[in-house]
């Protein structure tokens, strides 16, 4: 049986577009309302809930555990090219986390 949790977080970015895999120094830590059972495999599905800025906000998730995850707005980076300055106004990001 799967266990679900939901939440939302306010995110913005004042940093350049993140282009180095594994570098989560500019990510925001989110803690689940309740920890999932030890040994669980957890997935997180985030969605931007608002439209507060003209640039398209991409979302990056990292380090998902039974107690939380890291997230950041990362504006577009395509085909090896940065297509924006990386800064983005505050948006509301909703998320669903579940065991699988």
Segments and roles (model prediction):
Residues 1-40, 47-100:
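Extracellular receptor-binding modules and their adjoining Ser/Thr/Gly/Asp/Asn-rich linkers
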